[in-house]
From Swiss-Prot:
ANK repeats lie at residues 71-100, 104-135, 207-237, 241-271, 296-325, 327-351. The gene is OPG037. One of its GO terms (cellular component) is host cell cytoplasm. It comes from Variola virus (isolate Human/India/Ind3/1967) (VARV). This is Inhibitor of Apoptosis OPG037. May interact with host caspase-9-Apaf-1 complex. GO terms for biological process: symbiont-mediated perturbation of host apoptosis. Belongs to the orthopoxvirus OPG037 protein family.
Length: 446
């Protein structure tokens, strides 16, 4: 047994020898009984350009064409993968099962590499020896036709002519056009003839993605494919994640002229489209949308402030669109550049929303940097009064604002002449500092 295994071992090494001699090979085989240890038949079926007589000798010696190697491959699968039709024919004539499935649940028909003539010859061979049509699906739920993501028109039509169904989808609901778009080099010409063969260019997959969704989500856009798919697809059609082909173009930072192409096919510009333009700071798209009749309002300005879209803020300002409480929402976002931009454009620091002020929100966020910027822009006495009320109501830490309030009172002596303001300020400070400190100075005002 050791001698048999040793002879097989040297026969496996012979696969790596460049100048193989059939007579030498036959002599080596004389000392061998198939053991299955080295998968000899598999190894020789995987040699490109090998004379099929080597495989024939192995088959005559008793090596089975219907055994798998350690990876679950059959000799017929291996020969199909490397496009050796002569070995494919040899295996089939010696009983290889054309419907055997490898670990990926693929039959030999799934492996269609080679020129059109070679692929068509292999298809004819497999079908001639009993390959079943529409009888297998791989791990992705694809039959051989659907698994071929980048077929030539001639091969595709050949596969269809022998009975394969073209109007099918994989387990994700993707049809041939979806899958072709996911290949390395999708082509408009391929999609064009697929459409002529009746494959839907607008069918959504199980996630709601049409082929146009897929092409619009790619980093590099194929304009020819977009032009081909546009007439049959609603650019506002949302997938289950809420994205449309139009919003996907915006999210992938596509050029304005391409987005305009999709906009030109739509009668409706949705609020979602506007919101995504603002989120990605696409002021150029806002301008295109505005030219098509879409009106903006303070809600759009507010969103631009919240997400920090400086270019969109500038565009809206130039078109006299503002939000009176913009500074408040800029503080909430803690985006200093936005705060600076609004201050530069003379937005008020006296915004009050639901009883909260810009300053009280700085205290809540523990942000002394933005607080100092706001205090330098002269909030009103009423604003400071409301700030103290909001801080006390929500029991916020006063330490961050006490120095600013003290300086404010010092610079605004009229503040303490208002009993309401003074009483609030006295209580605010008294509750903060240590017991025993005298506040008689306050009594001098009254």
């Amino acid at each position: 047994m050791d001698n048999i295994m040793s002879a097989e071992y040297y026969l496996s090494l012979y696969t790596k020898y460049n100048s193989k001699n059939l007579d030498v090979f036959r002599n080596m085989l004389q000392a061998i009984e198939p053991s299955g240890n080295y998968h000899i038949l598999h190894a020789y079926c995987g040699i490109k350009g090998l004379d099929e007589r080597f495989v024939e000798e192995l088959l005559h010696r008793g090596y089975s064409p219907n055994e798998t190697d350690d990876d679950g491959n059959y000799p017929l699968h291996i020969a199909s993968k490397i496009n050796n039709n002569r070995i494919v024919a040899m295996l089939l004539t010696h009983g290889a099962d054309p419907n055997a499935c490898d670990k990926q649940h693929k039959t030999p028909l799934y492996y269609l590499s080679g020129t059109d003539d070679e692929v068509i010859e292999r298809i004819n061979l497999l079908v001639q020896y009993g390959a079943k049509i529409n009888n297998s699906v791989d791990e992705e739920g694809c039959g051989p036709l659907l698994a071929s993501t980048d077929p030539s028109e001639r091969v595709f039509k050949k596969i269809m002519s022998i009975g394969f169904e073209a109007r099918i989808v994989d387990k994700f609901g993707k049809n041939h056009i979806h899958r072709h778009l996911m290949s390395d080099n999708p082509k408009a010409s391929t999609i064009s003839w697929m459409m002529k063969l009746g494959i839907s260019p607008s069918k959504p997959d199980h996630d709601g993605n049409t082929p146009l969704h897929i092409v619009c989500s790619k980093t590099v856009k194929n304009v020819d494919i977009i032009n081909l798919l546009l007439p049959s697809t609603d650019v506002n059609k949302q997938n289950k994640f809420g994205d449309s082909p139009l919003t996907l173009l915006i999210k992938t930072l596509s050029p304005a002229h391409l987005i305009n192409k999709l906009l030109s096919t739509s009668n409706v510009i949705t609020d979602q489209t506007v919101n995504i333009c603002i989120f990605y700071d696409r002021d150029d798209i806002l301008e295109i949308i505005n030219d098509k009749g879409k009106q903006y309002d303070s809600t759009d300005f507010k969103m631009a402030v919240e997400v920090g879209s400086i270019r969109c803020i500038k565009y809206l300002l130039d078109n006299d669109i503002i939000c009176e409480d913009a500074m408040y929402y800029a503080v909430l976002s803690e985006y200093e550049t936005m705060v600076d931009y609004l201050l530069f454009n003379h937005f008020s620091v006296d915004s009050v929303v639901n009883g909260n002020t810009c300053m009280s929100e700085c205290v809540r966020l523990n942000n002394p940097v933005i607080l100092s910027k706001l205090m330098l822009h002269n909030p009103t006495s009423e604003t400071m009064y409301l700030t103290m009320k909001a801080i006390e109501k929500d029991k916020l830490d006063k330490s961050i604002i006490i120095p600013f309030i003290a300086y404010f009172v010092l610079m605004h002596p009229d503040f303490c002449k208002n009993r309401r303001y003074f009483t609030s300020y006295k209580r605010f400070v008294t509750d903060y500092v240590h017991e025993g400190v005298s506040y008689k100075v306050f009594d001098d005002y009254f």
